[in-house]
């Protein structure tokens, strides 16, 4: 068991830069970086230390409580291969599937024939359907807080690779190609983050 598992869980306080300024605080970029990493670490530790399904579900759905914009202010500018950057990408992925489950399913289904091994790693139903895809991304995020975090990241990476392949196949054009490439890049970052977590170096 790593040092991460021994630390006492703390409830993260989600004070974005704009919220801090609204309460009279001065904006400090260095402090913002510190807050980003501390909140990400606290969120993961709270879920993993609690070992409580109810806590896990609240953390999976935290965007529903505080809004994606709050997480964006906290985490979106952090490196992709950092804990806050990694969590940001996972929550964005979940939010996209929640907002466009039919599109996500169509692109995922189209990508399976190009990336069969990734489909197996992601663990989606076959054939995929919108409800199943939505459950899948929740299950992946749930693994961050109550399972093997590195495996959760590898599943998210595999899911992203399948969607990337499907999007490139069924949506020709430079914009879709760029989006597909971005998804592929995110998959590489998630895979790298999984390796870092296993090495105790994802902060």
Placement of each model-derived feature along the sequence:
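N-terminal domain-start signal
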Residues: 1-87, 91-95
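Long, highly charged low-complexity segments enriched in Glu/Asp and Lys/Arg with interspersed Ser/Thr
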Residues: 14-17, 21, 34-37, 93-119, ...
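Long, hydrophobic, amphipathic alpha-helical segments used as structural scaffolds
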Residues: 70, 101-108, 141-144, 148-152, ...
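Glycine-rich, aromatic-bearing surface loops/beta-hairpins
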Residues: 161-203
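Conserved binding-pocket/active-site segment within a compact domain
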Residues: 113-175
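Short, solvent-exposed segments of well-ordered alpha helices
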Residues: 53, 57, 80, 124-127, ...
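Generic detector of well-ordered alpha-helical segments enriched in charged/polar residues
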Residues: 33-44, 56, 60, 72, ...
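Long, charge-patterned amphipathic interaction tracts in eukaryotic proteins
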Residues: 31, 65, 69, 76-135
């Amino acid at each position: 068991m790593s040092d991460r598992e021994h630390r006492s869980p703390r409830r993260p306080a989600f004070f974005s830069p704009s919220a801090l300024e609204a309460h009279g605080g001065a904006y400090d970029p260095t402090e913002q970086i510190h807050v980003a990493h501390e909140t990400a670490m606290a969120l993961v530790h709270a879920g993993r230390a609690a070992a409580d399904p109810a806590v896990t579900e609240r953390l999976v759905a935290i965007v529903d409580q505080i809004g994606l914009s709050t997480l964006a202010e906290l985490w979106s500018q952090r490196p992709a291969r950092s804990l806050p950057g990694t969590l940001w990408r996972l929550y964005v992925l979940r939010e996209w599937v929640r907002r466009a489950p039919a599109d996500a399913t169509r692109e995922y289904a189209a990508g399976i024939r190009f990336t069969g091994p990734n489909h197996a790693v992601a663990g989606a139903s076959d054939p995929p359907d919108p409800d199943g895809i939505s459950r899948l991304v929740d299950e992946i995020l749930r693994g961050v807080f109550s399972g093997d975090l590195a495996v959760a990241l590898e599943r998210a990476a595999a899911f992203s690779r399948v969607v990337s392949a499907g999007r490139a196949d069924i949506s020709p054009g430079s914009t879709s190609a760029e989006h597909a490439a971005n998804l592929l890049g995110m998959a590489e970052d998630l895979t790298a983050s999984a390796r870092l977590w296993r090495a105790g170096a994802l902060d």
